[in-house]
Amino acid sequence: MEIKKVEGKTEEEVLKGLDIKDIHYEITEVPAKLFKSKKVELKYIEKDEIKNYIKNYIDNFAKSLNKTINVEIRENEVGYNIMLISEENSILIGKDGKTLNSIQLLLHQAINNLTGFNIRINVDAANYKSNKERKLEREIKRICKEVLNSKIEAKLDPMNSYERRIVHNIL
């Protein structure tokens, strides 16, 4: 993957000729020096390069496990949704989705270290995370009704930050 840099006097000049939909970019202003005017610097990477990197990363991961994993990458407004398809999804998911979360963390860190961009990545296998979200949502709504009726506090099981965010959004 190659991070490209473009310099210019204004943001419009720097973005000229680039399709914003096809790149991840960061614009920084370089302050003016004694006899020089200020500059605008654009760092960008193409989304196709990131998709290829994700596929290669997962393929190397699969080779180290001696497994075959197919990868589907969908782009959304904030990042990428990656669906892992394998005959042995239980190995990819792990207990309570911990292996899946670890894969997601490693992939996010690898992309962040390589590009310097904070790109959101969501890794899922066999729709495990979406099913878990629905179960969690139903359970939280049920517990909320019980608390409202009985006026007694309820304690929830320990959750990771993503699950806590879902709970806060429901409440």
What are these regions (language model features)?
Residues 1-170:
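RNA-contacting regions in translation and RNA-metabolism proteins
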